[in-house]
């Protein structure tokens, strides 16, 4: 530890990122209660102004939006990152009666870190003893689902996905929605707890929720649900502190990150992860091979199954919800990458390829896969089967190495399911638009509809600094075709470690892609927010336009750059066209004129009817005697 690190006592000094706890404008946190009082599902309600009298003068119902920010945006909750978040799930877990509280950490590395006095000032102070399944028990959500049990977690996500659709229909918010094209997905008009159970039992969806992460607000990943996004954080050997990583977490979930992966490769990985999990209301994923490599000082050849197994247990006992495991990088696939333009670009994939070549043995993650499953089901950690041979350039897309690994991931998925372990599949990468559908179709075929989770894909390689856009295009497409979760890409992709602004930009880009996919699939209620914003735009309700957007702050700032006065917030024009050329204003004038013409036409028509009736009453004679 450096002198500076020794001087910092995080258990005393750590503070929440103040930007992350600011309430959203005209929004309030609401909770929808389930069948029991401790199932309280958070949503964000956006209040809207009334329609101006010029436009008919009606009240506008508030709009509910999916909320990933946890208690950080609830003004009634006092946030203290030194203590972590409140417990959400322990009562549900205890009631099932199939877990036990351990006397302490069971991983060798976890015990070493706990006994290192020098780390005391960096350590999260309120570490619980971990839980584990009782001997012979399986505590995965898939296992419960296959037993016909609807867990509290399943009910929770059903309420969360449904977003009070019945009330929205009653309020007329669903009167306008285009029919979607879902490419064979089976999206019901209403998400019920039983439907959630069926999808998890079938393997088409997962609820990543480790029994040692009781702070998590359950969410679901699957093609028949809302498309989710993941945001990456994590330190590197070149910098970033524990407090900065927690700030990235809280900042990311504020803007809509459904899950977060901690990809730390620098110092204090164990301690950083503890702080992140204890303060995270969303599932946390990791790539355990990264930390295992740090334990052997970066020498891939020195990795062993025993060391990796201890790392899995260490992280499972901390509460990691899903592991990326690169078990599909087989020895026979490595030569297939030799003629690629960019070779093996996955860090985990390259580590395992190097180990295989150095020992001329099969990947130990593959040969010990059943043993990994035993660990996963003891803590309910979900698999995210890593695509270690994903293409790193569009030239390498859809090649033999990529699809060979995908077929192996399909085999491993079926092994995981035999153990009732939840599983999703990671995908590319760099893929031109015309090859994206083939990726999705191949994954559905090989992996029997297990959820697909892709990094983009990037659709072109010519835009360093703008890869959030090149990948957002591919993300929207593959989300429409059936991908369940999209891993965000920031503007810093290929260039450097993202800062807070980059994280926000990446998340907003991917929220757009995910929402566009939901619209295209015809997800029930997906168009409510679009309709509300479009109506606000036509009626010049500027504040409602800002507040209904994914990023109210940026929308307001852009508007105020040219029209900063408060009077501009009620003006019937913006700086794009000015007062005389605003299409919305002209359209309203056309409507008013048409209404007047219609009124005149009605008067004329009424007069004509009266004259016709008089004509008939007078005998229907064309001429009358004088």
Swiss-Prot record:
Binds 1 [4Fe-4S] cluster per subunit. The cluster is coordinated with 3 cysteines and an exchangeable S-adenosyl-L-methionine. [4Fe-4S] cluster binds at residues 574, 577, 582. InterPro entries: ThiC, ThiC-associated_dom, ThiC/Bza_core_dom, ThiC/BzaA/B. Its cofactor is [4Fe-4S] cluster. The keyword Cell wall biogenesis/degradation does not apply. GO terms for cellular component: cytosol. Residues 1-22 are annotated as: Disordered. It catalyses: 5-amino-1-(5-phospho-beta-D-ribosyl)imidazole + S-adenosyl-L-methionine = 4-amino-2-methyl-5-(phosphooxymethyl)pyrimidine + CO + 5'-deoxyadenosine + formate + L-methionine + 3 H(+). Pathway: Cofactor biosynthesis; thiamine diphosphate biosynthesis. GO terms for molecular function: 4 iron, 4 sulfur cluster binding; carbon-carbon lyase activity; zinc ion binding. Substrate binds at residues 232, 261, 290, 326, 346-348, 387-390, 426, 453. Zn(2+) binds at residues 430, 494. It holds the Pfam family ThiC_Rad_SAM. Residues 10-22 have a biased composition (Polar residues). Disulfide bonds: none annotated. The keyword Metal-binding applies. Keywords: 4Fe-4S, Iron, Iron-sulfur, Lyase, Metal-binding, S-adenosyl-L-methionine, Thiamine biosynthesis, Zinc. One of its GO terms (biological process) is thiamine diphosphate biosynthetic process. It comes from the Bacteria. Its EC number is 4.1.99.17. Belongs to the ThiC family. Homodimer. Catalyzes the synthesis of the hydroxymethylpyrimidine phosphate (HMP-P) moiety of thiamine from aminoimidazole ribotide (AIR) in a radical S-adenosyl-L-methionine (SAM)-dependent reaction. PANTHER family: PHOSPHOMETHYLPYRIMIDINE SYNTHASE, CHLOROPLASTIC, THIAMINE BIOSYNTHESIS PROTEIN THIC. This is Phosphomethylpyrimidine synthase. It comes from Pseudomonas putida (strain ATCC 700007 / DSM 6899 / JCM 31910 / BCRC 17059 / LMG 24140 / F1). The lineage of its organism: Bacteria, Pseudomonadati, Pseudomonadota, Gammaproteobacteria, Pseudomonadales.
